[in-house]
């Protein structure tokens, strides 16, 4: 780039900074922040006890790849684990 272009870019950048500074001066940046502690974990609905579905275990074990004699799912340990 030539010297003229560099000076033009510097001048435009300075104008942008000046305009931005003018806008910032209109805001009160010295105000205090407010913090809120919310005890409610689920604000969309009431928490209720979960009902278990007795058919779930049976259906789950049907689609499991391998189940032992006690009725537990047998899984392969990841090769990346020691």
Curated annotation (Swiss-Prot):
InterPro entries: Asp/Glu-ADT_sf_sub_c (IPR036113), GatC (IPR003837), Glu-ADT_subunit_C_archaea (IPR010120). It holds the Pfam family GatC. One of its GO terms (biological process) is regulation of translational fidelity. Its EC number is 6.3.5.-. One of its GO terms (molecular function) is asparaginyl-tRNA synthase (glutamine-hydrolyzing) activity. The keyword ATP-binding applies. It is an enzyme of class 6 (ligase). Keywords: ATP-binding, Ligase, Nucleotide-binding, Protein biosynthesis. It catalyses: L-glutamyl-tRNA(Gln) + L-glutamine + ATP + H2O = L-glutaminyl-tRNA(Gln) + L-glutamate + ADP + phosphate + H(+); L-aspartyl-tRNA(Asn) + L-glutamine + ATP + H2O = L-asparaginyl-tRNA(Asn) + L-glutamate + ADP + phosphate + 2 H(+). Belongs to the GatC family. Allows the formation of correctly charged Asn-tRNA(Asn) or Gln-tRNA(Gln) through the transamidation of misacylated Asp-tRNA(Asn) or Glu-tRNA(Gln) in organisms which lack either or both of asparaginyl-tRNA or glutaminyl-tRNA synthetases. The reaction takes place in the presence of glutamine and ATP through an activated phospho-Asp-tRNA(Asn) or phospho-Glu-tRNA(Gln). Heterotrimer of A, B and C subunits. This is Probable glutamyl-tRNA(Gln) amidotransferase subunit C.
